């Protein structure tokens, strides 16, 4: 059990209401943590109506890289692609994730498939959603040559 998110203990949903919104905030000191938090829902407090959903929290980090740095392969690979290369070896059939030339050759498709435009679709990469926004930003800085700016 991870305790790094604050959200209301209970919430009233009116009859016929199709959606609900509520604030979810990160607890102080937990920015570097990552994991899942379950939200259990019941109707009128009845256990028979129970269901749950998960919140996923990604770690917020700058990888120890100063803002404005030009990102090179040695800065990006161990922080972003190495995990995916080791965890998903079948991916190397399409793009060898451990080869800088192959990554740069596939720059445009990688930028497209890791962009927010694909979020929420089956085309968003990686399919397992294991790449944090900070990792995607580092990969984007490497591929575009833009100076590194960690997401806030």
Task: Outline where the language-model segments fall.
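Aromatic- and Gly/Pro-enriched helix-to-coil junctions and flexible linker segments
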Residues: 1-152
């Amino acid at each position: 059990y991870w305790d790094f998110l604050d959200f209301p203990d209970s919430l009233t949903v009116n009859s016929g209401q199709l959606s609900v919104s509520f604030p979810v905030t990160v607890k102080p000191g937990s920015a570097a943590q990552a994991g899942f938090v379950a939200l259990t829902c019941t109707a009128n407090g009845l256990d028979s109506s129970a269901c749950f959903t998960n919140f996923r929290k990604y770690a917020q980090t700058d990888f120890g890289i100063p803002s404005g740095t030009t990102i090179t392969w040695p800065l990006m690979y161990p922080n972003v692609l190495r995990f995916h290369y080791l965890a998903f070896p079948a991916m190397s059939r399409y793009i060898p994730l451990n080869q800088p030339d192959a990554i740069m050759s596939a720059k445009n498709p990688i930028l497209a498939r890791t962009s927010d435009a694909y979020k929420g679709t089956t085309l968003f990469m990686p399919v397992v959603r294991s790449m944090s926004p900070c990792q995607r930003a580092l990969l984007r800085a490497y591929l575009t040559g833009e100076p590194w700016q960690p997401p806030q």
